[in-house]
Design a protein with these regions (language model features):
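Short capping segments at the starts of secondary-structure elements
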Residues: 14, 24-32
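Pre-recognition alpha-helix immediately N-terminal to the DNA-recognition helix
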Residues: 19-23
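Amphipathic alpha-helical dimerization/coiled-coil segments
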Residues: 89-131
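Short acidic, hydrophobic short linear motifs in intrinsically disordered regions
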Residues: 31-40
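Short helix-coil junctions and helix-kink-helix linkers
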Residues: 39-47
């Protein structure tokens, strides 16, 4: 049983490439295909423009994106809320990888060499905030 709240009525799990597009739109707001395409190319090896265009069209059909066609350049925006999508994905991850146990996830994170002293301090502060509630 997971401790994460899931919004199963609107639960949609984007693919890795769909998440890449959503991340750009969440970070920069409504954008043209060209802008999203350029940002994706900054993040990884060359992506073909027509592939980005087709992906965003499919995401619109799935209800993940909205398209403003009022000007010559179509502007896309994310319909899915970042917090909900990431919460759903995190819940699924914890369920499948850590038997629904957030504490098992935290133990794995804290035992990881990638966790810096600064990040550990942030975690301690978060735990203090949770304890004081």
């Amino acid at each position: 049983m997971s401790l994460f709240k899931k919004d199963t009525s609107s639960e949609m799990v984007p693919t890795k490439t769909e998440m890449d597009v959503l991340q750009v739109l969440w970070q920069y707001g409504p954008s043209t295909v060209r802008f999203v395409h350029d940002k994706l190319n900054e993040q990884k090896e060359a992506v073909i423009y027509t592939s980005t265009l087709k992906l965003m069209q499919v995401m619109k059909e799935k209800g993940m994106l909205a398209r403003d066609e009022s000007s010559m350049k179509h502007v896309y925006s994310a319909v899915l809320q970042e917090e909900k999508v990431k919460g759903n994905m995190l819940g699924r991850f914890v369920d499948s990888m850590y038997n629904g146990s957030p504490s098992n996830l935290m133990m794995a994170l804290l035992g990881n060499d990638k966790t810096s002293a600064e990040e550990l301090e942030k975690i301690k502060e978060l735990l203090k905030q949770v304890d004081s509630k």
